[in-house]
């Protein structure tokens, strides 16, 4: 079972750590995405991003990613957008079809960084 401390202290090895993430770790990682501590939030984001490249484990939390994409906070919007992008590959239920216009609207987000991250995430 992962801990906040382990993730933040081992951020340089997060891609390898992501390979070991199991379903029990997801709730902690999703909670950490809302952390006010940048290193915690970023560690959780990276772990989930790398896990999503190889596994559909996060796809069952699709609705929480969409909720983040709709958040007032630009950090949360960016996290939601980038993780949605990583999980579209697992979208057998075609949930992305329901949000594609909203997703693409963030190419013109009021925060430039969110716009940039949306455009960059389209390649996934």
Predicted regions: what they are:
Residues 1-31:
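N-terminal "cap/leader" segments of large eukaryotic alpha-helical scaffolds
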Residues 102-124:
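A contiguous pocket-lining binding segment that forms or flanks enzyme active sites
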Residues 53-54, 89-90:
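Alpha-solenoid helical repeat scaffolds
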Residues 7-11, 23, 38-39, 74-75, ...:
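Alpha-helix N-cap/helix-start positions at coil->helix boundaries
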């Amino acid at each position: 079972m992962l801990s906040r401390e382990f993730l933040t202290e081992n951020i340089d090895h997060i891609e390898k750590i992501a390979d070991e993430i199991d379903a029990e770790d997801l709730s902690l990682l999703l909670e950490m995405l809302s952390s006010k501590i940048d290193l915690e939030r970023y560690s959780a984001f990276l772990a989930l991003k790398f896990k999503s490249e190889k596994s559909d484990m996060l796809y069952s939390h699709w609705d929480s990613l969409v909720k983040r994409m709709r958040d007032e906070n630009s950090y949360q919007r960016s996290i939601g957008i980038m993780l949605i992008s990583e999980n579209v590959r697992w979208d057998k239920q075609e949930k992305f079809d329901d949000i594609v216009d909203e997703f693409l609207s963030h190419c013109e987000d009021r925060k430039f960084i969110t716009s940039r991250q949306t455009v960059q995430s389209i390649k996934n």
